[in-house]
């Protein structure tokens, strides 16, 4: 019998404002995520706004996979608080460097991952609609689920696996490498 595994994916999206001569994907991504988060807060719970906060009590985001924290390794505030929406379904919608990204909630099988990935696509559609309502036609935001913007920036979709924190890093490398190859 197979051991149940917690899994999920993170999908990176390309973003562009096609009518602008100069692109600022960080700003456009921030507008997109914030517009969706603000709309979701105001339309939830009978119109009473509330925010799901990111809890770092059991997290050390500055640590690498070995658990080491180099001096000055704290993530920028923008990666942890400013443009980061934890959604009601457990997914996360955020700006990852210079593009919008959605991570699924923890899932119990591949079918559930696919369902949440599809719901992420719908969230992006709604986010574009809400953001574009606040922008001029020249500032329209368009998001693509692809893997390259044609200017050297590439995007992707990556898997996530739950691993016990007590597992030695060398064991992860030994077994994960075999699994991925």
Predicted regions, residues:
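Inter-helical turn/loop segments and adjacent helix faces that build the functional surface
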Residues: 166-172
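Histidine-centered divalent-metal-coordination microenvironment in nucleic-acid enzymes
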Residues: 147-164
């Amino acid at each position: 019998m197979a051991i149940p595994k917690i899994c999920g994916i993170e999908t990176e999206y390309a973003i562009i404002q096609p009518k602008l001569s100069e692109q600022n994907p960080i700003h456009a991504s921030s507008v997109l995520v914030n517009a969706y988060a603000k709309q979701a807060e105001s339309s939830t719970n009978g119109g009473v706004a509330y925010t799901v906060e990111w809890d770092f009590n059991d997290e050390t985001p500055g640590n690498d996979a070995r658990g080491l924290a180099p001096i000055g390794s704290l993530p920028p505030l923008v990666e942890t608080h400013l443009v980061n929406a934890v959604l009601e379904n457990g997914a996360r919608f955020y700006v990852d460097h210079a593009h919008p990204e959605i991570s699924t909630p923890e899932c119990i099988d591949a079918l559930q991952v696919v369902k949440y990935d599809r719901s992420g696509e719908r969230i992006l559609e709604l986010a574009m609609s809400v953001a574009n309502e606040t922008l001029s036609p020249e500032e329209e935001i368009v998001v693509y689920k692809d893997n390259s913007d044609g200017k050297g920036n590439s995007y992707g979709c990556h898997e996530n696996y739950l691993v016990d924190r007590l597992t030695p890093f060398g064991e992860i490398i030994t077994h994960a490498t075999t699994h991925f190859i």
